[in-house]
Amino acid sequence: MGLEKSLVFFPLLVLLALGWVQPCLGRESSAHKFRRQHMDSEGLSSSSSSPTYCNQMMQRRKLTRGHCKPVNTFVHEPLADVQAVCFQENVTCKNGQTNCYRSGSSMHVTDCRTTGSSKYPNCAYRTTQKVKRIVVACEGDPSVPVHYDGSVEDST
């Protein structure tokens, strides 16, 4: 009799446990979100110079869900080089936090900005390639980029 009760309650316990665990499994980490939104290491090819690069990448990376994200930047450098920025010059973030870092050297980036005629769901972007020093917010142990805070022109 006790075994029968256990067999009835065990599936219920499993379902209850999955209900708690599943939302955690589906949540994207800040570091993964940064990579999805801003990293395109292979993009330093002819494809990133295409006028439709931003239109394609913004959709592919799911940055146009529910609205047109007005501005986004893709970095065309190896992930290790971008992660290394977290150990370079510490600067104050735009929001006043102190966990931002500026790259010591310039990096290839593509800026995507909505055009004047862009209206959801038909998001349209202007593609501009640049070479700039980037600023990222970093968190964790080891410290990794979790937010793209901007870029700065070289002072040389």
From Swiss-Prot:
Q: Which PROSITE patterns match?
A: RNASE_PANCREATIC
Q: In which tissues is it expressed?
A: Pancreas.
- Enzyme Commission no: 4.6.1.18
Chief site of localization: secreted
- Which positions bind substrate? K33, R36, K69, P70, V71, N72, T73, K94, R113
Task: State the SMART domains in the record.
Answer: RNAse_Pc
Q: What does this protein do?
A: Endonuclease that catalyzes the cleavage of RNA on the 3' side of pyrimidine nucleotides. Acts on single-stranded and double-stranded RNA.
Its protein name is Ribonuclease pancreatic
